[in-house]
């Protein structure tokens, strides 16, 4: 949550003759009231990677930032904002290696896709809110392994949902 607010707070900054002033929406103060405040340094979360089997995520779709979604203690921690862009992502494993390709949406990974090198994969992990690449790799390798055991398909296909101008 703090990693998302690190990005969103710039949307609420206003430059005045006295300096920068922030006009935060109520969700920001509710986070503070609930004790959600991180004092450790971190990299801001610039996007999220999601399955999208129903093709829900498109440019302009409104993002709802919730904790404990669809539960009694559900909590909106940031205001709704539109999706800026979406990219397809395809991950597969080769032993303990995670191979990652990215393409334009609806291109069905092919002509315009490109594979991320190790440095780009590290950036992807940080930008997706993981503390380091190993956490990211292990998270997605577990998902791929579980899917493989269920279906025989050892891969992950989803979307990178951007709320900033960043693209790969």
Predicted ranges, named:
Residues 1-168:
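Glycine-rich, low-complexity intrinsically disordered segments
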């Amino acid at each position: 949550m703090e990693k998302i607010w690190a990005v969103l707070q710039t949307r609420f900054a206003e430059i005045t003759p006295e300096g920068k002033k922030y006009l935060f929406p109520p969700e920001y103060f509710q986070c503070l009231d609930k004790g959600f405040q991180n004092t450790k340094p971190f990299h801001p979360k610039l996007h999220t990677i999601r399955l999208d089997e129903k093709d829900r995520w498109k440019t302009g779709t409104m993002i709802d930032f919730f904790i404990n979604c669809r539960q009694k203690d559900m909590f909106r921690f940031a205001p709704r904002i539109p999706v800026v862009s979406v990219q397809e992502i395809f991950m597969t494993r080769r032993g303990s290696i995670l191979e990652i390709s990215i393409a334009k949406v609806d291109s069905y990974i092919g002509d315009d896709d490109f594979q991320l090198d190790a440095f780009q994969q590290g950036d992807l992990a940080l930008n997706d809110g993981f503390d380091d690449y190993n956490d990211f790799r292990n998270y997605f390798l577990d998902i791929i392994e579980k899917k493989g055991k269920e279906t025989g398909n050892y891969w992950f296909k989803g979307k990178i949902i951007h709320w900033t101008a960043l693209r790969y």
